[in-house]
C-alpha cells in the first residue's frame, strides 16, 4: 500500500512503535503528524531498546525519510536529547533523514510550567498529565499564541513575536496561578541553545511530501496514543489534546489532499491504560500485578505502572470504527501464555442493562464489565513465526477478537523483537 497509517485503537501503548519499526522496510518515508513528547513508542532492534517520544520510528532504517509534521507539539529540548541518545547508540541522524515542518509550533518551557501548575490546582480532580506541557501548548496553538519552528530562521521577527507572546503568557502564570513571571532572557537563552540545534532540520516538509508523492514514493503515517485518548472522540476529559485519529494525518502532515490506502489499527492482546479516567475492565490486586509484571507494563515516558485488564471488545470495536481501521495488528499475545483461563470483556452493563456499544463518556463510570473466560494455551509461543505454529487455543483467541470487532487481524506479535511477528 502506498499510503498507510498506523494508529492506536485503545488507550495508547498498544505497540505502534514496534509495528512502524517492522513495516518501515516497505516504506520510503515515515511521518509523525500529531502529539508531542508525552508518550513513547517502544522499539527493540539491532541498535537496542528505545522509547521514542518525538522522532518517527523509521529513524532506524537506512534510506527512510522521517518527518515531524505541522501537527506535532515540537519540544526542541526533548527532541535534541532524543537525537543525542540515538546517536550514542550508533543511529545516524542528519537533516537528510530527519526533517521538521517549518509550520510546527514550538512547545516552550512555560508550557511545561503551566502544565505542572494546573495539575496542582486540580488536585484530586487532575487528569493524570505527564506534565510535558501538551495541553497548554495546544490551547495556545488554537489561540494563535505560539511560535512556529520556521521563525527560528527569522531572528528579528522571532524576537518581536516572543516578546508579545511572553507578555500574554505571564498574565496567566501570575494572575491565575500566582507564579513568578517567566523572564525573556531565560527564554532567549533556551532558544539559543535548543532552537539553534534543531534549526538545520527545519524544512518546508509539506512541499517535500508532495514531491515524494509525485515521485511515487510510499509514505507511512505514525500516530501517537490511541482512539480513546482522541480529543474529540475519546473518553473526555481524560484525553490528550490533539487528534489521535488516522483522519487527521492529511492535516497534521501537510499533505492535505491525502487519501489513505490502508489504516492499520494496533490492539494489545489485553488492555492497558496510563493515567486517570474510566477504565471499565480494570483488574485490581494480585491478578493485575501478575499481568502487569508479565507484560512489563510501565509507562515509556513516565515509568508509571499501567493499569491493566482483559481485552475489551466493546472499546476495541469502537476504536476500530472511529479509526476507520482496515486491518489490525494484535500485539503481545505471548504475554498471556501464563494464564490457564483468559478473561475477555464482551459487553458492559449500565444501570442494569447490557450493551455492546461504547457509551457516551459520562456513562462510563456507571459501566461494569461483562467478562467471559476462554481457554489459555499455557505454553511459550515466542518462537512462532507462522499461523500454524500457534496452539489451537491461541488461534481461537485471535479469531474471537477478529469476529467481535469486525476487522481482519493481519499481524500477531509474539515478542518484542523485530522478527517476532506472524503475518496472516
Residue ranges and their predicted role:
Residues 1-424:
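Non-transmembrane, aqueous-exposed alpha-helical and coiled segments at domain scale
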Amino acid at each position: 500500500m502506498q499510503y498507510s497509517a498506523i494508529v492506536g485503537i485503545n488507550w495508547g501503548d498498544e505497540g505502534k512503535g514496534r509495528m512502524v519499526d517492522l513495516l518501515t522496510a516497505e516504506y520510503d518515508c515515515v511521518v509523525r503528524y500529531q502529539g508531542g513528547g508525552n508518550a513513547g513508542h517502544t522499539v527493540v532492534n539491532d541498535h537496542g531498546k528505545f522509547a521514542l517520544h518525538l522522532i518517527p520510528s523509521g529513524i532506524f532504517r537506512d534510506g527512510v525519510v522521517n518527518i515531524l509534521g505541522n501537527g506535532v507539539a515540537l519540544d526542541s529540548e526533548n527532541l535534541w536529547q532524543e537525537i543525542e541518545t540515538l546517536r550514542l547508540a550508533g543511529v545516524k541522524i542528519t537533516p537528510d533523514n530527519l526533517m521538521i515542518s517549518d509550520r510546527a509550533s514550538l512547545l516552550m518551557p512555560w508550557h511545561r510550567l503551566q502544565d505542572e501548575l494546573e495539575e496542582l490546582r486540580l488536585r484530586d480532580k487532575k487528569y493524570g498529565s505527564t506534565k510535558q506541557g501538551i495541553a497548554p501548548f495546544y490551547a495556545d496553538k488554537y489561540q494563535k499564541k505560539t511560535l512556529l519552528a520556521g521563525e527560528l530562521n527569522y531572528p528579528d521577527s522571532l524576537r518581536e513575536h516572543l516578546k508579545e507572546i511572553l507578555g500574554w503568557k505571564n498574565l496567566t502564570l501570575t494572575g491565575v496561578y500566582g507564579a513568578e513571571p517567566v523572564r525573556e532572557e531565560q527564554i532567549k537563552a533556551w532558544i539559543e541553545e535548543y532552537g539553534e540545534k534543531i534549526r538545520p532540520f527545519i524544512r518546508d516538509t509539506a512541499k517535500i511530501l508532495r514531491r515524494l508523492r509525485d515521485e511515487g514514493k510510499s509514505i507511512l503515517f505514525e500516530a501517537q496514543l490511541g482512539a480513546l485518548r482522541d480529543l474529540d472522540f475519546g473518553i473526555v476529559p481524560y484525553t490528550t489534546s490533539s487528534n489521535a485519529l488516522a483522519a487527521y494525518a492529511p492535516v497534521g502532515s501537510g499533505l492535505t489532499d491525502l487519501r489513505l490506502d490502508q489504516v492499520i489499527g494496533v490492539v494489545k492482546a489485553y488492555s492497558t491504560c496510563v493515567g486517570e479516567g474510566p477504565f471499565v475492565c480494570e483488574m485490581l490486586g494480585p491478578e493485575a500485578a501478575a499481568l502487569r509484571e508479565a507484560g512489563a507494563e510501565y509507562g515509556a515516558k513516565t515509568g508509571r505502572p499501567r493499569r491493566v485488564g482483559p481485552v475489551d471488545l466493546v472499546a476495541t470495536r469502537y476504536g476500530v470504527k472511529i479509526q476507520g481501521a482496515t486491518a489490525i495488528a494484535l500485539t503481545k499475545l505471548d504475554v498471556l501464555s501464563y494464564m490457564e483461563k483468559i478473561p475477555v470483556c464482551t459487553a458492559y452493563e449500565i444501570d442494569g442493562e447490557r450493551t455492546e456499544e461504547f457509551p457516551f463518556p459520562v456513562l462510563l463510570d456507571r459501566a461494569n464489565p461483562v467478562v467471559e473466560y476462554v481457554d489459555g494455551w499455557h505454553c511459550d509461543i515466542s518462537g512462532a513465526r507462522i499461523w500454524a505454529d500457534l496452539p489451537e487455543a491461541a488461534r481461537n483467541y485471535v479469531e474471537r477478537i477478529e469476529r467481535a470487532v469486525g476487522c481482519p487481524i493481519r499481524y500477531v506479535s509474539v515478542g518484542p523483537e523485530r522478527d517476532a511477528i506472524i503475518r496472516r
